[in-house]
């Protein structure tokens, strides 16, 4: 299997430190398997998506050294594709129109199995899934629908993202099956938490990646800090990206939430290691 991963941020704000951790894990997993790392801009939120945020996201990835192997595609430029796929499902009797929107029909019998390489097999009862809106009445696609279509279009093999997306996965598997796609491998990462074990926010520390650049931190230091958020297989403190690629294994990803510790940006021998 050719490994292809993707980092798919929404340009509704600056690049969050938790998102950079997701990008890093996608990058090193792809490179470990001689695969491809993609970036996709999920800008279907017309009101909140801004070009300035797209520029900031790409600048941040460039600064930290996680450059994609593609020219990022924008979902806002693919609305016709999503519309065509939605009506293909309607024509096949797998979706229906509802007050101007289009919903996917969900068989309420049985369950949907999510096979996750970190959290294991998880079954979600289908009776708990609503008939999903896949196209809104204004013909804009919903997140789940265009997400699946683009992952298939870009030949993504492994979806690596935060574990807050686990409840989304059975919905997306239903879409995958309805569209007749091959499907994907899933790797969900533990959430990045503050010291109070609540989801990391600005009250814990700076969450915007470029804030760390402005404060004078080295990108290598930030990468090392992020690598330790939810993954560990060694007592070593300092890694180059090449070393991370070599030693990274999915089975070393932890399930428990990863506590953000600003002190991980400081090590006694960091300057010597990175300047050598």
Predicted regions and their residues:
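Short acidic (Asp/Glu) and glycine-rich catalytic loops that position anionic groups and cofactors
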Residues: 37, 65-66, 152-155, 200-206, ...
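Beta-strand segments within the central parallel beta-sheet cores of soluble alpha/beta enzyme folds
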Residues: 39-40, 72, 185-189, 238
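Active-site cores that bind ATP or allylic diphosphates and position pyrophosphate for catalysis
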Residues: 75, 88-202, 208, 212, ...
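Single conserved hydrophobic/aromatic residue that forms the stacking wall/gate
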Residues: 266-276
């Amino acid at each position: 299997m050719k490994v292809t991963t993707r980092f798919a941020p929404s340009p509704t704000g600056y690049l969050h430190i938790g998102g950079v951790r997701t990008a890093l894990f996608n990058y090193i997993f792809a490179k470990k398997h001689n695969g491809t790392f993609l970036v996709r801009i999920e800008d279907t939120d017309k009101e909140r998506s801004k070009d300035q945020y797209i520029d900031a996201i790409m600048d941040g990835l460039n600064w930290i050294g996680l450059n994609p192997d593609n020219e990022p595609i924008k979902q806002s430029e693919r609305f016709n594709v999503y519309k065509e796929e939605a009506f293909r499902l309607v024509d096949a009797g797998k979706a229906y129109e509802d007050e101007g929107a289009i919903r996917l029909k969900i068989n309420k019998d049985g369950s949907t199995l999510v096979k996750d390489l970190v959290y294991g097999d998880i079954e979600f009862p289908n009776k708990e899934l609503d008939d999903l809106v896949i196209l809104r009445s204004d013909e804009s696609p919903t997140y789940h629908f265009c997400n699946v279509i683009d992952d298939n279009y870009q030949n993504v093999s492994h979806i690596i993202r935060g574990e807050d997306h686990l409840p989304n996965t059975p919905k997306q598997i239903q879409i995958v099956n309805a569209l007749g796609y091959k499907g994907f491998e899933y790797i969900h990462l533990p959430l990045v938490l503050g010291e109070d074990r609540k989801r990391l926010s600005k009250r814990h520390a700076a969450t915007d990646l470029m804030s760390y650049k402005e404060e004078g931190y080295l990108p290598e230091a930030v990468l090392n800090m992020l690598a330790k958020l939810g993954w560990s297989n060694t007592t070593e403190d300092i890694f180059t990206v090449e070393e991370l690629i070599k030693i990274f294994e999915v089975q070393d990803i932890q399930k428990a939430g990863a506590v953000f510790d600003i002190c991980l940006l400081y090590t006694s021998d960091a300057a010597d290691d990175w300047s050598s």
